[in-house]
Amino acid sequence: MRAAVAIFPGSNCDRDMIVALKKITGKSPLKLWHKDTEAPNLDLIVIPGGFSFGDYLRCGALAARSPIIKNIKNHISRGGALLGVCNGFQILIEANILPGSLVRNRKLLFTCRETTLEVQNSLQSPFLSSFNTGDCLNIPVAHNEGNYIANTELLKELEDNGRIAFKYKQNSEIETDYNPNGSLHDIAGILSKNGRVLGMMPHPERSINSLHGGTDGLKFLTKSIEEIVG
């Protein structure tokens, strides 16, 4: 498994992701700095969470213009897998790798808590091939701008073509705040047209130890890696 984690000034979840990937694969992933203009052939690149460039202008806006983005787009064109988590998802949208927008949470407050994700009837994707529609994962979120919005046409295209990976799930009829940010259609993550790029707001790397709240993130990352290299 040839994996790498892309790191920007202000990234703060890169270490957690590196620990998670090493726990699964047995070796540390390569670290790609935002100024790197060359990268080896890789199976997977992960853009982790954090506050790249201090979230100036917009979350992910400056990072999306870093030299490494060209390499990341070349990686995608070669068929490589790409995962963007939280700020990584924001960067993918700002770089026009994934569609839509991520704006301030509906309550205009930072949110940090556990959420339940429901796997959707998605197109063939290595990130979801080992899961069934309706499977649930408990994975935490921590963000201020995770409210996914898109126009009606794009939302329909995402729904009709199986490009919605996860939705926040309501666990009971009396639960009213299951959607932590107000995302349209309860969207928590979306896929590229070929299913090999996934952007998601929840943090799987923060759910890899039963002593720290659960292991659903480890389950998700493990199955994703197995499919990517399989």
Where are these regions (language model features)?
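Short, flexible active-site-adjacent loop segments at beta-strand->alpha-helix junctions, enriched
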Residues: 88-89, 123
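N-terminal beta1-alpha1 cap of cysteine-dependent amidohydrolase-like domains
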Residues: 1-85, 92-99, 103-110, 118, ...
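Amide-donor transfer/coupling interface in amidating biosynthetic enzymes
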Residues: 34, 74-77, 105-230
